[in-house]
Amino acid sequence: MAYNNRPDASTAFTFDNDDRFVNQQPKGPDPLSANWSYDSAIDLFSLNTMLPETFPLDIPNDMLLDPKDFPTDLFAPPADISGFAISHSGEDSLSSDQESEDQPWSPAYRVSSLDSTTPDAPTVSPRSTEKPATRRRTTTQKREQATRWSSSPEMTPQEYPVTSQATTSPAPAPVSPPAASTSRKNSRSLSTDSQTATGRNAAKRAAHNIIEKRYRTNMNAKFVALEKAMSGSGVQKPTKGGSGPASLKKSEILTNAIAYMQELQDQNAALQKELALLKQNLLPGGLWRHNKENDKFRT
C-alpha cells in the first residue's frame, strides 16, 4: 500500500484503470519520514486530517456489476411482481395514522409525480379500504365495553358490558308520595295558622267580654241607686201579677227619674216664691208685719 500526502479539500480523486483510489495532488515531503524537521517547508494548512489515505480497492471480478443488469428506470417496480400501490400526496405524507404500517409503498408514484405536472388519480386497493372499516368496527366495539377500575391495587380491572338504555333506565318513581307529603305539610301549616288565628281571636274576645261585663255591672249599680232615690218620692213600682213589687226595667227607671226631677223643680219654685213674700213682711227690727194679705197667705 502506497502512502501519500493528506489531500486538502481542493484535491480531486479519480479511479484509474486498475481500480485504485489515486490522489492527483503532486507528492511532497512526507511529514512522517525520518529526515523531517520543523525547519522543513511544509504547508500545515494544506493537510486535511478528515480525508483518509489512498487505499486500493481489491474487488473480485465476480462482485463487479454489469451495466446491462441495471434497469433503465431504477425507481420503476419490477414487471413480474405486482404489489399494492398507495398514493402518497403532500397531505398523506404528514398523516399521523399509526396503523398504516402494513400498507405497501410504491416509489414509482414519487418519481412519476416529480416528472409529470398533472399526477394521475391515486388507486386504492380493496385491502386498504377494508382495513379502516374493520378498525372502526373494533374501536366501536371497544368503546361499547366500559372498563371499571377498583380502588384497591390488588384487584384487577373488570370489564362489564354496557347494556342498552332501555334495560338500565329505572322505572319512574311515583309522584303521589311527594304530593301527599306536600299536601300534608300544607294542611299542617294551615292548621297551625288557623289555630294561632283562633287563639288570637279568643284572647281578644275574652278581653272584650271582661270589659263589657264590668261596664254592665257599673251601669246596673247606677240604675239600682237611682231607683232607690226615687222610692221616697211617692213613685210606686208597678206590680207584676199583683203579688208584690217587682224590679223595674231600665226604661221605666229612667221615666220615673224624669218625672221625679220635674216634681222637684216645681217644689223648688213654690218655695222660692214663699221666701220672697216672707222677706217683704219682715221688718228691720225683726218684727213681723201683720196685714190681711199675709193672713190670707198663711191660711
Curated annotation (Swiss-Prot):
Residue span of region Disordered = 1-33, 81-204
In this chain, the stretch annotated as Basic motif covers 203-216
One Gene Ontology cellular component annotation held by this UniProt entry: chromatin
Q: What is its main location?
A: nucleus
Coiled-coil features, chain-numbered ranges: 254-281
Where does the record place it? Nucleus
Q: List the disulfide bonds.
A: none
State the conditions that upregulate or repress this gene.
Answer: Expression is positively regulated by the transcription factor srbA.
Q: Where is the composition biased (Polar residues)?
A: 188-199
Region Helix-loop-helix motif, annotated ranges? 217-264
What is the top-level taxon of the source organism?
A: Eukaryota
Where in this chain does the record put each bHLH domain? 203-264
Q: Where is the composition biased (Low complexity)?
A: 161-170
The record's keywords, sorted A to Z, are: Coiled coil, Nucleus, Transcription, Transcription regulation
Q: Which GO terms describe its biological process?
A: cellular response to hypoxia; positive regulation of transcription by RNA polymerase II
* Molecular function terms, GO-annotated: DNA-binding transcription activator activity; protein dimerization activity; RNA polymerase II cis-regulatory region sequence-specific DNA binding
Q: What happens when the gene is disrupted?
A: Impairs growth in a hypoxic environment and subsequent virulence.
What is the annotated role of this protein in its UniProt record? Key transcription factors critical for hypoxia adaptation and virulence. Plays a major role in regulation of heme biosynthesis and carbohydrate metabolism early in the response to hypoxia.
Name it. Transcription factor srbB
Q: Whose protein is this, by species?
A: Aspergillus fumigatus (strain ATCC MYA-4609 / CBS 101355 / FGSC A1100 / Af293) (Neosartorya fumigata)
Q: Which gene encodes it?
A: srbB
